């Protein structure tokens, strides 16, 4: 569960960094 949350958070941060809206 922890890994899933961490993965989701990391992916969100990466998307925010690559695609700043």
From Swiss-Prot:
Keywords: Stress response
Superkingdom as given in the UniProt entry: Bacteria
Triggers of expression: In stationary phase, induced at 45 degrees Celsius (at protein level).
NCBIfam families found in the cross-reference section: stress_YobI (NF038179)
This protein's name: Uncharacterized protein YobI
């Amino acid at each position: 569960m922890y890994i899933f949350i961490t993965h989701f958070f990391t992916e969100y941060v990466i998307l925010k960094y690559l695609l700043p809206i």
